[in-house]
C-alpha cells in the first residue's frame, strides 16, 4: 500500500470517474477516493444519458478517450436519436441505461486500469504547503499525498435533503454528507454558495396500470454513443411510458404548498430552471390543465421505474395522493419519495480554463461543485480536469478546448468566464458553432488531439483514420462522377425530385432533400460499388457522416470562416497586462468588477456579461491593435 500518488481524485461520480481514468490512462499514478465503492458512477437522478446537447458532450467524451459512451452503450435498455426532424446539427443521442449495470460496468473498468487505485473513505481536509495543495486527509485520519488533487464532490458538500418540512443531512438519500472541505476552502479565500436540485419518486411497476399509458419504444438502428467498433443494444430493450397529470392531481399538489420547502422559505437556494419540480410547474404554469410525465425503466431485471417530470420535495402523503389521482397510478406503490437537496458549490470564475483554481495551485474542480447539473456536463469537466491534473504533474501546455472545437469547450468557457447564478445545463443554443459541433463528427474534431496527448489509444486512432479515408473516398467519388439526364431522370422523378435538364456531377444532386446516398446509389451502380467498399461494421455511420458533409458543406464552410475570425481574438492574450480600475475610458461595469476575473484573451473578455464592444475596442487600442 502506498500513500503517495501523482493525482488524487475525490469523489467517484461521473466527473470523478472520467478524471481518474484519464489521468491513469495518460500514465499518472492515480488514487480515486469514494465514500462507497458500490455507488461508483451512481445515476443519482434519472437512469438516462444524453439528450439535447448532452448527447453531443458524451460523444466528445468518447472521442477524447473517456468511458461514458462505452459504458452507456454496454448498459443501454433503450436508445433514441432526438431531433431527427431537424438538421444534423441538432441531432442528439439519448439512452436509458440499466442503473445497476452502469455502476457495475464503470467499476469493472476502473478496477482494471493500470495506474489506478481506489480507496473507500471520506475526505475532510486538504493538505497544503502555503497556497499549494499537496494531498488530502480522510475521516479515518489517513493522509495521502499527490502533485495534483481533483475535487468532484457532487451534491455531497454539506448536503441537506428536504421532504416537506423534514430535513435530512446527506449527499443522496440514505448517504452521508461531506463536511469540512467547504469550510476550509472558504477560509482560504474561495467563494462558496448554495444550489438546489431535486429528484422524483421511484415507482414499483407492479402497481402501475400500463394499459392507461402510451408506450414509447426505442429505436433499433446503428446509432450509439461510442465511436469504438463495439456491439451495442446488448441488453433487453425496454419501452418508456407516458401519461399526464390532471386537475385533480394539481388540486392535491396545491394543498401541499404550505409545506413545500420551495414555498415556505425552507429552501433559499436556486434550482435548475429547465428541470422544475412539479409544484413549481403548477404555480408557474397555473393555466395548464396537465403536464406530461414519462415513466422510465431503471433496469433490465428490476421493477423500479423513474417518474420523469414529477420531481418534488412535497410531503410524502401529498406526493402519494397526487399520483393516485392519475388513472395509471391509482394503486401506486413507491420505493422512495421525491426530495430536494441543497449543497455547496464554488463560483467557477475562480478557475482557469484548465479547471485549476486560481487561489490554490495544483487543485482542480470538476462537476456539480462548479455549479453545473447533469451527468454529461460533469463527465466532460472531469475528463478535462483529469487530463490537466496529469499535465500539471508531468509538464506540458494546459489542455483547453475552444468554443469552435467542442461543447465541452463551450461549457467550460461559459463557467469560467460568465459564472453561474443557477445550475448550468448545456443546450445547443449556448454554442455559436452548432454546425461544427455535430454529434456525428466529434471523433474528427477531437480524437487526434487526444491521441497526441497520449490519452486516446492506437486502436481508437486507427478507427478514426479508417473512417476519414472511407468518408473522403465517398465525397471524392461524388465530386468527380458525371451524371447524364437520360440515365437518371426516371429515377429522380420516382423519388419526387426534379429531373435534370443537362448533365452534372453527382455531388450536385445529393443536397436535394429527397436524395440520400443510399437511394441515389440505387440509380448509379458505380456509386453503389463505392459505398460497398466501406467497412461493413461501420458502414451506416460512415455513409451518414459523408452525406452530412456533402449536404451541409456550404453552411459548414461559412461557420468555419466565422469561427476563424473570432479565433484571431482568442490569440490576443491580455492576462495580467492591465489595471482595469485605472482605465477611465472603460465602462463603469468593466472597471468595477466585470473584468475582475482577469480574462486570458480579448475573446474571453468580450464574452463577459456587462462588457460592451466599446470596452473591447479600448483594450485593442491600448494594445496597439
Question: PLM features: what roles do these ranges have?
Answer:
Residues 2-15:
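Beta1/beta-strand and adjacent pyrophosphate-binding region of the FAD-binding site
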Residues 3-5, 139-148:
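Core beta-strand elements of the Rossmann-like FAD/NAD(P) dinucleotide-binding domain
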Residues 10, 143-154:
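Short hydrophobic core segments
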Residues 21-125, 140, 152-169, 176, ...:
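Conserved N-terminal/central alpha/beta ligand/cofactor-binding core
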Residues 36-38, 54, 182-320, 417-502, ...:
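An anion/pyrophosphate-binding glycine-rich loop and adjacent beta-alpha core
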Residues 127-143:
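Conserved beta-strand-loop-beta-strand element in the redox core of flavoprotein oxidoreductases
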Residues 306-372, 399-413, 539-593, 598:
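A glycine-rich dinucleotide-binding beta-alpha-beta segment and adjacent secondary-structure elements
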Residues 430, 447-617, 621-624:
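Extended, charge-enriched "interface" segments that sit outside catalytic cores
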Amino acid at each position: 500500500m502506498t500513500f503517495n500518488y501523482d493525482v488524487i481524485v475525490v469523489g467517484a461520480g461521473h466527473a470523478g470517474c472520467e478524471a481518474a481514468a484519464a489521468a491513469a490512462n495518460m500514465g499518472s499514478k492515480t488514487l480515486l477516493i469514494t465514500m462507497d465503492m458500490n455507488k461508483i458512477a451512481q445515476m443519482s437522478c434519472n437512469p438516462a444519458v444524453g439528450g439535447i446537447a448532452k448527447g453531443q458532450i458524451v460523444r466528445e467524451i468518447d472521442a477524447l478517450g473517456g468511458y461514458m459512451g462505452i459504458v452507456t452503450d454496454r448498459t443501454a435498455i433503450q436508445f433514441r436519436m432526438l431531433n431527427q426532424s431537424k438538421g444534423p446539427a441538432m441531432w442528439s443521442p439519448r439512452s436509458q441505461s440499466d442503473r445497476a449495470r452502469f455502476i457495475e460496468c464503470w467499476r469493472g473498468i476502473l478496477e482494471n486500469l493500470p495506474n489506478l487505485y481506489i480507496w473507500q473513505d471520506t475526505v475532510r481536509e486538504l493538505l497544503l504547503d502555503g497556497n499549494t495543495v499537496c494531498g488530502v486527509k480522510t475521516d479515518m485520519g489517513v493522509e495521502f499525498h499527490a502533485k495534483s488533487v481533483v475535487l468532484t464532490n457532487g451534491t455531497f458538500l454539506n448536503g441537506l435533503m428536504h421532504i416537506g418540512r423534514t430535513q435530512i443531512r446527506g449527499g443522496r438519500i440514505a448517504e452521508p454528507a461531506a463536511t469540512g472541505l467547504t469550510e476550509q476552502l472558504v477560509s482560504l479565500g474561495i467563494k462558496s454558495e448554495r444550489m438546489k436540485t431535486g429528484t422524483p419518486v421511484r415507482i414499483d411497476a407492479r402497481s402501475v396500470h400500463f394499459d392507461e399509458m402510451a408506450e414509447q419504444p426505442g429505436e433499433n438502428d446503428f446509432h450509439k454513443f461510442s465511436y469504438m467498433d463495439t456491439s451495442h443494444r446488448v441488453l433487453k430493450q425496454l419501452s418508456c411510458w407516458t401519461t399526464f397529470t390532471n386537475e385533480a392531481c394539481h388540486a392535491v399538489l396545491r394543498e401541499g404548498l404550505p409545506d413545500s420547502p420551495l414555498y415556505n422559505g425552507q429552501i433559499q437556494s436556486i434550482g435548475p430552471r429547465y428541470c422544475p419540480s412539479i409544484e413549481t410547474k403548477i404555480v408557474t404554469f397555473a393555466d395548464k390543465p396537465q403536464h406530461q410525465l414519462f415513466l422510465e425503466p431503471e433496469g433490465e431485471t428490476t421493477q423500479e421505474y423513474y417518474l420523469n417530470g414529477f420531481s418534488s420535495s412535497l410531503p410524502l402523503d401529498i406526493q402519494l395522493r397526487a399520483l393516485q389521482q392519475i388513472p395509471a397510478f391509482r394503486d401506486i406503490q413507491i420505493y422512495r419519495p421525491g426530495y430536494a437537496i441543497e449543497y455547496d458549490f464554488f463560483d467557477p470564475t475562480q478557475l482557469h480554463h484548465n479547471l485549476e483554481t486560481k487561489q490554490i495551485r495544483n487543485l482542480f474542480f470538476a462537476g456539480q461543485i462548479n455549479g453545473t447539473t447533469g451527468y454529461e456536463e460533469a463527465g466532460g469537466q472531469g475528463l478535462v480536469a483529469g487530463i490537466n491534473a496529469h499535465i500539471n504533474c508531468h509538464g506540458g501546455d494546459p489542455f483547453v478546448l475552444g468554443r469552435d472545437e467542442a461543447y465541452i469547450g463551450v461549457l467550460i468557457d461559459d463557467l469560467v468566464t460568465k459564472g453561474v447564478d443557477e445550475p448550468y445545463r448545456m443546450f445547443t443554443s449556448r454554442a455559436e458553432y452548432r454546425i461544427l459541433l455535430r454529434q456525428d463528427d466529434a471523433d474528427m474534431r477531437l480524437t487526434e488531439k487526444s491521441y497526441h496527448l497520449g490519452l486516446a489509444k492506437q486502436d481508437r486512432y486507427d478507427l478514426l483514420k479508417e473512417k476519414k479515408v472511407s468518408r473522403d473516398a465517398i465525397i471524392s467519388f461524388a465530386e468527380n462522377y458525371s451524371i447524364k439526364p437520360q440515365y437518371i431522370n426516371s429515377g429522380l422523378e420516382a423519388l419526387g425530385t426534379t429531373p435534370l435538364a443537362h448533365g452534372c456531377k453527382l455531388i450536385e444532386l445529393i443536397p436535394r432533400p429527397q436524395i440520400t446516398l443510399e437511394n441515389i446509389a440505387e440509380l448509379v451502380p458505380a456509386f453503389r460499388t463505392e459505398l460497398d467498399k466501406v467497412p461493413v461494421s461501420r458502414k451506416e455511420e460512415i455513409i451518414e457522416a459523408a452525406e452530412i458533409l456533402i449536404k451541409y458543406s456550404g453552411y459548414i464552410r461559412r461557420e468555419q470562416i466565422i469561427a476563424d475570425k473570432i479565433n484571431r481574438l482568442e490569440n490576443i492574450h491580455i492576462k495580467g497586462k492591465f489595471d482595469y480600475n485605472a482605465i477611465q475610458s472603460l465602462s463603469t461595469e468593466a472597471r468595477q468588477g466585470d473584468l475582475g476575473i482577469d480574462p486570458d484573451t480579448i475573446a474571453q473578455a468580450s464574452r463577459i456579461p456587462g462588457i460592451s464592444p466599446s470596452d473591447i475596442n479600448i483594450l485593442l487600442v491600448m494594445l496597439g491593435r
